[in-house]
Design a protein with these regions (language model features):
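Subtilisin-like peptidase catalytic core
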Residues: 77-147, 250, 264-266
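Extracellular S/T/G-rich loop segment that most often corresponds to the catalytic His/Ser-adjacent loop
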Residues: 179-248, 252
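Active-site core segment of subtilase-fold serine proteases
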Residues: 2-101, 105
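Active-site/binding-pocket entry motifs
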Residues: 53, 68, 113, 196, ...
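Generic beta-sheet signal
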Residues: 48, 161-164, 169-171, 190-193, ...
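Glycine-rich, phosphate-binding/catalytic loops in enzymes
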Residues: 61-66, 156-158, 186-187, 206
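An often Trp-containing, charged/polar helix-loop segment at the C-terminal end
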Residues: 252-274
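Substrate-binding/access-modulating region of protease and related hydrolase catalytic domains
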Residues: 113-185, 227-230, 234-235, 267-272
Length: 274
């Protein structure tokens, strides 16, 4: 990809621009305390995307699959449990990242995007409402909408997720444009911080809270293949993997505490006295 194609939000995570942030005084090293030895067992993860290829060597078994479809004769949407292929490859990429990091997690595919990687905001809302009602532990949203009409319903849903115990991990737009639900305080918003091996970073200035590897990363892709890609979507998958590991090792942590643990594990975290 060219420089012009790279995520604009990444500039927040240039090492020279990172400011130290006060973090919880957790046991050191924080990463070892937070997710060391965890494999994601017992954590239910929903990937809301283009579908996930069941049986891909980097994904393994898809434990459940639903699609959002139109209700005949109206504008309503319904969620139907049904196996489906990945129509693009994007969802498989996210799922493969999560499963590689947390191989024992329970993984669900929630299909809302089509073969052009486009979908309707109403389908996203229906999918999120279902995922919240099903009380998933982690929901990855490497997609968004900029439609102002969807601001309020999405904010309400993300608040329901937050207070109901579901951690929503959302990729910010790849260009400087406000989209939802990544802009809400109730979610964990993520942008690319660089190539593989780039450290987790925390940004004190909104809207992109966390930076994670998302530049020239090799990911699972449709038809059993792989692809080298760049984008905030893939950074969100990485953070969803971390959140899955944290929730497996510390199952009692509510969403706000999970975000605090991530911030404490960031490369620019500064310890404060208790």
């Amino acid at each position: 990809m060219t420089e012009q194609d790279r995520p604009a939000w990444s500039e927040f995570f240039v090492p020279s621009r990172l400011r130290p942030v006060a973090a919880l005084p957790l046991p050191q090293p924080v990463a070892e305390w937070a997710w060391g030895g965890s494999d994601g067992a017992g954590v239910r993860v929903a990937v809301v995307d283009s579908g996930v290829e069941d049986g891909h060597r980097l994904v393994g078994r898809v434990d459940g699959a639903v699609v959002v479809e139109d209700v005949e004769g109206g504008d309503d949407k319904r969620v139907v449990e049904r196996a489906h292929p990945d129509l693009y490859g994007h969802g498989t990429a996210i799922a493969g990242t999560i499963r590689t990091m947390a191989p024992a997690c329970e993984l669900w595919s929630v299909q809302v995007l089509g073969p052009s990687l486009k979908g309707r905001a109403a389908s996203l809302v229906a999918a999120l409402r279902w995922a919240v009602q099903q009380r998933f532990d982690v929901v990855n949203l490497s997609l968004s909408t900029g439609g102002s009409a969807w601001f309020a319903p999405l904010q309400d849903l993300m608040d329901d997720a937050f207070f109901g115990g579901t951690v929503a991990v959302c990729a910010v737009n790849n260009v400087f444009s406000a989209t939802f639900p990544a802009q809400f305080a109730s979610v964990i918003s993520v942008a690319s911080s660089g190539p593989p091996g780039s450290p987790l970073a925390y940004n004190v200035d909104p809207p992109a809270e966390f930076g994670a590897p998302g530049e020239d990363v090799t990911v699972a892709w449709r038809d059993g293949g792989t692809a080298t890609v760049t984008g905030n979507s893939f950074s969100a998958g990485y953070v969803s993997g971390l959140v899955t590991l944290i929730r497996a090792k510390h199952p009692g942590l509510p969403p706000f505490a999970v975000k605090s643990v991530l911030a404490a594990a960031a490369v620019n975290a500064a310890r404060v006295s208790p």
